[in-house]
UniProtKB/Swiss-Prot annotation:
Listed EC numbers: 6.2.1.-
Enzyme class: ligase
Residues binding ATP, per UniProt: 217-225, 358-363, 444, 463, 561
Entry comment, domain topic: Both substrate-binding domains (SBD1 and SBD2) are involved in the substrate recognition, and are sufficient to confer the substrate specificity.
PANTHER family linked to this entry: BCDNA.GH02901, LONG-CHAIN-FATTY-ACID--COA LIGASE
Coiled coil residues, start to end: none
Pathway(s): Secondary metabolite biosynthesis
Species per Swiss-Prot/TrEMBL record: Fusarium pseudograminearum (strain CS3096)
Disulfide pattern: none
Residue segments, region SBD1: 288-358
Protein name (record): Acyl-CoA ligase FPSE_09184
GO molecular function: ATP binding; CoA-ligase activity
Family: Belongs to the ATP-dependent AMP-binding enzyme family.
Length: 579
């Protein structure tokens, strides 16, 4: 059985508009929608407003400066990549669009990755140049030193929206291979008098092959992978999300927040979609709860795009929200991971006037595969499929699931879907032929269920790699996690499987205690209470017994996903607590 978008979802244009680069595509639509004087971006830290004229002028000069500095002949098909390691700022977007205009692609490095991980990414996608925000210069230099890149790679720094603090100044690397660092402003100054380049016009099929971004997966269950994302992938995803939002919420533009990292596909995609929609976007360098809450009232933010850990934090600290002006907020959209029903209900209880809109997506699917309509919210689900997305489910025996309420691995087919992984020792770049159907196995386990409104909703059960096999039974960690968070003493939890001589595997829970309920209780007493809460109410295969570890925090990726691979490392030498 193949699942598709609901009847009310609009169709994608056919053929897709693939003549322009991503930035030019978004800016052209923006200019159609609103006047040039409207604020396209607002950088929160310095309260700087950017109009579309400002953006296009800087984009044109930056592309000309890059072309001149790197001796690129106008019209030449330049097929190189630059690496960008930066906190959120408008220049990060403009820089990537300028690189696209001269024919290049961008390797988006995540600051939460280790220097070793970034070095491995750069070895797989060797950059022609590196651009680093001031606060990440030292980390970028360390990653460079650990890579096999030659010392002639040019380095450029830029300050972003916030002036660099003294301690953010680059620390010289003690090596003869240490790079010389220029600034983006110096580069721009050289291009002030240069003639502007013509905008890129893709030939037929070129946008399907031309890589715009290399983004890394979160690596929640294993190592990070580098995904090649084309201009077609991004443009298709913008249209899928943007047209669905217009059909379900209306075409009116909004004021939105961009604090999710631009180097992660979720933050990158929604910011492009905001631009295409005509929204005004308030850019924050990262997530700081107090600064975000102030910004919501100051800029009258309408919709918050969040990840489950932030939603959990807001629901646990609902009293803090009352100290700020939240009257403009109408919607919160969840992405970056499934939002369990219990977390949904906690947030709804904290702010009953907010519509909570769950969604689902992956880096390999270029961001968003499903989303909810405000008129069809189904707690615990990840929404309905977006236009052009098709999903089938494959069960443990390799058969395609033929009905509702049956679990299977999600396989997806979409114009926004995977172009390829970059070469690994055991896996070559995968580039499926576009003229054939290509179903990508996502590694997520899901099922479909009918909502009260009669629509097919996708429910994410768990990651295949995270499923726990107890006495031959497949146990979803999410089932245990959802139940544990119902207990007042549990703030956050993550469940993994560990080896067991009798059952094969058993569940083990990492738990962050809720400070208002549990700090005064001993770990032994609290462990007993939580164990009884879980083991007396869930099936035997879900029992924890004494396999509970209390931690101050859970390791997370830049997008807020819990890194279970790090938790598995911690239990390599674990033994049950003494009784």
């Amino acid at each position: 059985m193949i699942f598709t978008a609901p009847a009310y979802a609009p169709a994608l244009p056919s053929p897709l508009p693939l003549q322009q680069t991503i930035g030019d595509f978004c800016l052209a639509k923006r200019r159609e929608r609103q006047g040039a004087s409207d604020s396209l971006f607002i950088e929160a830290a310095i309260d700087r407003k950017w109009t579309i004229d400002d953006i296009e002028a800087r984009l044109g000069r930056m592309a000309a400066a890059l072309s001149s500095a790197w001796n690129i002949t106008p019209g030449q098909k330049w097929h190189k990549t630059v690496a960008i390691l930066a906190s959120n700022c408008v220049d990060t977007l403009i820089l990537s669009w300028a690189v696209h205009r001269i024919g290049g692609g961008c390797l988006m490095l995540q600051p939460t990755s280790s220097a070793d991980e970034m070095a491995a990414h750069m070895d797989r996608v060797p950059p022609f140049a590196m651009f680093l925000s001031q606060d990440l210069l030292t980390l970028g230099q360390e990653a460079f030193q650990k890579s096999s890149l030659s010392s002639n790679v040019p380095f450029y720094s830029f300050s972003g929206a916030e002036a660099p603090k003294p301690q953010q100044t680059a620390v010289p690397v003690a090596s003869q291979d240490a790079p010389n660092i220029s600034t983006l402003d110096d580069l721009m100054a050289t291009g002030k008098e240069l003639p502007l380049l013509e905008k890129t016009s893709f030939s037929e099929g070129e946008a399907s092959r031309r890589v715009a971004y290399y983004c890394t997966t979160s690596g929640t269950s294993g190592f990070q992978r580098v995904v090649a994302i084309t201009h077609e992938n991004i443009i298709a995803s913008i249209l899928q999300a943007g047209l669905f939002i217009e059909a379900t919420k209306g075409p009116a533009s909004e004021v939105t927040l961009a604090f999710l990292p631009f180097n992660h596909i979720y933050g990158l995609l929604i910011t492009h979609t905001f631009t295409w929609r005509g929204d005004s976007t308030v850019v924050h360098s990262g997530f700081n709860m107090m600064e975000i809450l102030i910004s919501i009232g100051k800029h009258r933010i309408n919709t918050l795009y969040l990840v489950p850990p932030i939603i959990n934090a807001l629901s646990r600290n609902a009293s803090i929200l009352d100290r700020f002006d939240m009257s403009s907020v109408r919607y919160i959209v969840n992405g970056g991971g499934p939002l369990p029903k219990e977390a949904f209900l906690k947030m709804k209880a904290a702010r009953p006037d907010w519509q909570i809109i769950p969604g689902w997506g992956q880096t390999e699917g270029c961001g968003i595969g499903s989303l909810s309509s405000p008129k069809d919210i189904f707690p615990g689900s990840s929404g309905v499929l977006l236009p052009g997305v098709r999903i089938r489910l494959r069960d443990d025996d390799g058969r395609i699931v033929q009905g509702l309420e049956e679990m299977g691995e999600i396989e997806i087919e979409s114009p926004s879907g995977l172009f390829g992984y970059v070469d690994y020792a055991d896996e070559a770049l995968l580039s499926p032929p576009k003229e054939e159907e290509f179903w990508w196995p996502t590694g997520d386990v899901g099922l479909f269920r009918i909502s009260p409104n009669g629509e097919q909703h996708l429910f994410i059960v768990d990651r295949i790699r995270d499923m726990i096999k107890v006495k031959g039974n497949q146990v979803a960690p999410g089932q245990i996690e959802d139940h544990l968070t119902k207990h007042a003493a549990v703030a956050e939890t993550a469940v993994i499987g560990i080896a067991d001589e009798v059952a094969g595997e058993r569940a083990l829970a990492f738990i962050v205690r809720e400070s208002s309920h549990a700090r005064e209780m001993s770990e032994a007493d609290l462990r007993k209470i939580i164990q009884e809460h879980n083991d007396l109410e869930l099936p035997e295969v879900c029992r924890l017994q004494d396999r509970i570890i209390f931690v101050d925090e859970l390791p997370k990726s830049a997008s807020g996903k819990i890194l279970k691979r790090e938790l598995r490392k911690q239990v390599a030498t674990w033994s049950p607590p003494q009784k």
